[in-house]
UniProtKB/Swiss-Prot annotation:
Function of the molecule: Binds to actin and affects the structure of the cytoskeleton. At high concentrations, profilin prevents the polymerization of actin, whereas it enhances it at low concentrations. By binding to PIP2, it inhibits the formation of IP3 and DG.
Native source species: Apium graveolens (Celery)
MF GO annotations: actin monomer binding
UniProt family annotation: Belongs to the profilin family.
Protein name, per record: Profilin
Pfam assignment, any one: Profilin
Length: 134
């Protein structure tokens, strides 16, 4: 399966319990910032944004004072899981980022999709990739 198919079929899929609803944007990006695959709606991410996200995985709380930036948009960092998941909130939407051995799995959502629904979609694929050694 191509990386684009993972984004299209497993991240931009219909949200369970919300017929016709999907995440706003999604991507799989290498730890080095290289884009493996992304939805057409995913923002243009900057190298320093990936560097900040990677640093927060290594040093949980690093992004809390400044916020998490994704394509220039600022998200307030909310509870995550050290070295595994970072979650951000912006207005009625937000972002979930799951770290795997080689990549970062991003899911961006807006209402009516809930933070919990986004977490399930992103973390399910991330856990699968970890199980595959990726």
């Amino acid at each position: 399966m191509s990386w684009q198919a993972y984004v299209d079929d497993h991240l931009m899929c219909e949200v369970e319990g919300n017929p016709g609803q999907t995440l706003t944007a999604a991507a799989i990006i290498g730890h080095d910032g290289s884009v493996w695959a992304q939805s057409s709606t995913f923002p243009q991410i900057k190298p320093e944004e990936i560097a900040g996200i990677m640093k927060d995985f290594d040093e949980p709380g690093h992004l809390a004072p400044t916020g998490l930036y994704l394509g220039g948009a600022k998200y307030m960092v909310i509870q995550g899981e050290p070295n595994a998941v970072i979650r951000g909130k912006k207005g009625s939407g937000g972002v979930t980022i799951k770290k795997t051995g080689q990549a970062l799995v991003f899911g961006v959502y807006d209402e009516p999709v809930t933070p919990g629904q986004c977490n399930v979609i992103v973390e399910r694929l991330g856990d699968y990739l970890i199980d595959q050694g990726l």
